[in-house]
């Protein structure tokens, strides 16, 4: 992939939504919500503090993250639909 986010931006691939509920009910495509969970594909170098130093991001490529329902901007990179968002849009890292 030839894309590198700048500053505090993060490139995220959504994970596939569940096909069935815990009770075994199959969810049709029309009823599925966009997942709010994804994998970090690439991350910027970080933000600049007031004294000019780079503050690195807490997330890195490979992290599984949760983000807000309306977070990020959809982009198409190498034929794949991805999200680019600020690190502050990420709610947490799933371990």
Swiss-Prot record:
Chief localization: cytoplasm
Biological process, per Gene Ontology: chaperone cofactor-dependent protein refolding
Entry-linked SMART domains: Cpn10 (SM00883)
Compartment(s): Cytoplasm
InterPro entries: Chaperonin_GroES (IPR020818), Chaperonin_GroES_sf (IPR037124), Chaprnonin_Cpn10_CS (IPR018369), GroES-like_sf (IPR011032)
GO MF annotations, alphabetized: ATP binding; metal ion binding; protein folding chaperone; protein-folding chaperone binding; unfolded protein binding
Keywords: Chaperone, Cytoplasm
GO CC terms in record: cytoplasm
Record bears the keyword Cytoplasm: yes
Function: Together with the chaperonin GroEL, plays an essential role in assisting protein folding. The GroEL-GroES system forms a nano-cage that allows encapsulation of the non-native substrate proteins and provides a physical environment optimized to promote and accelerate protein folding. GroES binds to the apical surface of the GroEL ring, thereby capping the opening of the GroEL channel.
Subunit structure comment from the entry: Heptamer of 7 subunits arranged in a ring. Interacts with the chaperonin GroEL.
NCBIfam families in the record: PRK00364.1-2 (NF001527), PRK00364.1-5 (NF001529), PRK00364.2-2 (NF001531), PRK00364.2-4 (NF001533), PRK00364.2-5 (NF001534)
Similarity comment: family membership: Belongs to the GroES chaperonin family.
Protein name, as recorded: Co-chaperonin GroES
Gene transcribed to yield this protein: groES
């Amino acid at each position: 992939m030839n894309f590198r986010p700048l500053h505090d931006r993060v490139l995220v691939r959504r994970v596939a939504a569940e096909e069935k509920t815990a009770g075994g009910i199959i969810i049709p495509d029309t009823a599925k919500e966009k997942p709010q969970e994804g994998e970090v594909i690439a991350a910027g170098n970080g933000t600049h503090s007031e004294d000019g130093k780079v503050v690195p991001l807490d997330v890195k490529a490979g992290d599984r993250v949760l983000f807000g329902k309306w977070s990020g901007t959809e982009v198409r990179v190498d034929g794949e639909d991805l999200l680019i968002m600020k690190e502050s849009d990420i709610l947490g890292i799933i371990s």
